[in-house]
């Protein structure tokens, strides 16, 4: 009889442990899903080119000044997203009522910048693959 009770208690502890593990897994899944949500659009080179053909769309390059000098998309405004005052500079330079077409070298920094800008009210579209994809598709860049 004693062994039966011990076995039952052990099983109950195991069930409680499983509930805790399941709860933690579900919480982690929920947090991962929430963190993975984007509040901006990603587009490919063709979509980006069509978007910026509309001159009311603001083109934003978020790379460094040195990268920008090597070549950038026509009409691009440079605001380095790596600077601590990036959002403040963006607020001062970019109209809140216009779509912002954001790019960087590979698409990672611009995705970060697009997320930060949409958090403060901007509508952003990120170029997947960045200027590397743009140039890879033989799209024009300028040094002017």
Residue ranges of predicted features:
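Rhodanese-like catalytic fold shared by cysteine-dependent sulfurtransferases
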Residues: 3, 19-22, 32-51, 57, ...
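Charged (Asp/Glu and Lys/Arg) segments that form or flank catalytic channels of large polymer-
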Residues: 25
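Repetitive helical segments and hydrophobic/amphipathic motifs
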Residues: 28-29
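Structural scaffold elements adjacent to functional motifs in cytosolic proteins
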Residues: 59-61
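Short, surface-exposed ligand- or partner-binding patches at beta-edge/loop junctions that are enriched
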Residues: 103
């Amino acid at each position: 009889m004693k062994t039966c009770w011990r076995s039952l208690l052990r099983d109950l502890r195991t069930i409680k442990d499983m509930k805790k593990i399941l709860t933690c897994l579900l919480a982690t899944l929920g947090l991962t899903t929430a963190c993975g949500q984007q509040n901006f659009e990603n587009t490919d080179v063709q979509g980006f080119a069509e978007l910026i053909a509309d001159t009311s769309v603001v083109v934003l390059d978020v790379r460094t000044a040195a990268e920008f000098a090597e070549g950038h998309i026509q009409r691009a405004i440079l605001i380095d997203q790596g600077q601590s005052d990036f959002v403040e500079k963006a607020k001062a330079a970019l109209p809140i009522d216009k779509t912002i077409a954001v790019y960087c070298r590979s698409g990672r920094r611009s995705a970060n910048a697009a997320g930060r800008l949409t958090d403060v009210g901007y509508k952003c579209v990120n170029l997947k693959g960045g200027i590397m994809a743009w140039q890879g598709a033989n799209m024009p860049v300028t040094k002017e």
